[in-house]
A protein has these predicted regions:
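Interdomain "pre-motor" coupling segment immediately N-terminal to P-loop NTPase/helicase cores
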Residues: 89-157
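Short amphipathic alpha-helical patches
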Residues: 35-36, 67-71, 121-126, 145-146, ...
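Noncatalytic partner-interaction/assembly domains of nucleic-acid and motor enzyme complexes
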Residues: 1-105
């Protein structure tokens, strides 16, 4: 039996399948590595694959079918996943709070995973990367943000840019 405690991971999964606006805003920034529980990670992967392929959010039924077609699950894992999927309901939460909390969750998980990766590099368990790669791993983790404004929007910022360019300097 799956414990039905509400965590940010479960709240995120619930809203990914129930709230299309939320899904479109956060899905590009969430990685499967942010989910520690294997069953939740698999559900996220299936949601991500479905949205990539069909450009809309999946139903719980379609998720159950997709999970049922996977060959890498034991019967016990499959049953746990189906049970979790059945609990995914649209929690009535404030959208701003949900976005802020999801962003903090992603930042915290990215930093945690970067530190764990750094430790495995230092311990010699990761043979593909050297200790010189640790700063870039941590930099990438610290850069996790839902803010996708990376410059000027030449149409929306035109008034402020016009004023800036025509300002008389003293």
């Amino acid at each position: 039996m799956v414990v039905l405690n509400q965590t940010i991971e479960r709240t995120t999964l619930s809203n990914l399948v129930a709230n299309e606006d939320y899904c479109r805003k956060v899905l590009p920034f969430i990685k499967s590595a942010y989910f520690n529980v294997k069953e939740e990670r698999i559900i996220f992967e299936e949601i991500h694959n479905f949205v990539d392929k069909y450009r809309k959010i999946p139903t719980k039924v379609s998720l159950e079918i997709e999970v049922g077609q996977r060959k890498d699950l034991t019967e016990n894992e499959h049953l746990k996943i189906v049970e979790i999927i059945k609990t995914l309901d649209n929690a009535n939460v404030d959208m701003d709070w949900l976005l802020d909390t999801t962003e903090k969750f992603c930042k915290d998980k990215a930093i945690y995973n970067a530190i764990v990766d750094g430790i495995s590099i230092i311990d010699g368990k990761d043979k593909n990367r050297t200790p010189d790669s640790i700063p870039s791993i941590l930099t990438d983790a610290l850069a996790v943000s839902f803010d996708n404004a990376v410059g000027h929007d030449y149409l929306l910022d035109s008034d402020s840019r016009f004023d800036f360019y025509h300002r008389v300097e003293e």
